[in-house]
Amino acid sequence: MTKKYWNINLEDMLEARVHLGHSTQNWNPKMAPYISAKRKGIHIINLTRTARFLSEACDLVFYAASKGKKFLIVGTNNAADEAVARASKRARCHYVNKKWLGGMLTNWSTTETRLQKFRDLRMEQKKGGLNNLPKKEATMLKRKLARLQKYLGGIQYMTGLPDIVIIIDQHKEYTALQECRILGIPTISLIDTNCDPNLSDIAIPANDDAMASIRFILNKLVFAICQGYFSDLRKP
């Protein structure tokens, strides 16, 4: 796989606060190789390592996208949810940004059933069918539809398991990560200083609490995905 240049520079990462880890008391010793210093009670992430692994991740998603592979982006913490939705829509990726429902991937048949109910309800609403129901029943179905939209809206067009899963905040999304490991789905994870770097196929050390840091990482990955899909469209 030929390496490409993704314009990942130190100044931009510093400005986005990518280097700021967790407190020195809240860390995983396995992250030691990815930490360059301690400052005012927090660990400072080695941005040279961040750039290296982010570049590797961009290469991977570029070539996967150029072959038409499908991606799922997962990030449900308060700093990530909005950025995940925007980035995913930009690159036409599936996403989960509110809550990971246990078994979403490992019990795919159940997820498919939920998605079909969601599609059916949404179609019924568009046709105006819910307006013809008794008020109590219509209200109940509208609430159900709103809940399905909240938790499944980002995967409503997913017809099978994703080829690659991108995880923002590995610590919070541990259940999603474990499901990917069980199914053998490759993962790219944004890992802060309290994470285990050995759990993902590509682990990108970075601040997972700052919106600017999350946006920086996602923007690079999404740009690479878009470039990959574009190169696929240009093939004769």
Swiss-Prot record:
Compartmental location: Plastid
Superkingdom of source: Eukaryota
Ribonucleoprotein among keywords: yes
Molecular function terms, GO-annotated: structural constituent of ribosome
Key words of the record: Plastid, Ribonucleoprotein, Ribosomal protein
Cited Pfam families: Ribosomal_S2 (PF00318)
UniProt-listed InterPro entries: Ribosomal_uS2, Ribosomal_uS2_bac/mit/plastid, Ribosomal_uS2_CS, Ribosomal_uS2_flav_dom_sf
GO biological process annotation, one example: translation
CC annotations in GO: mitochondrial small ribosomal subunit; plastid
Key word Disulfide bond present: no
Entry similarity comment: Belongs to the universal ribosomal protein uS2 family.
Name of the protein: Small ribosomal subunit protein uS2c
Organism whose genome encodes this protein: Cuscuta gronovii (Common dodder)
Biological classification of the source: Eukaryota, Viridiplantae, Streptophyta, Embryophyta, Tracheophyta
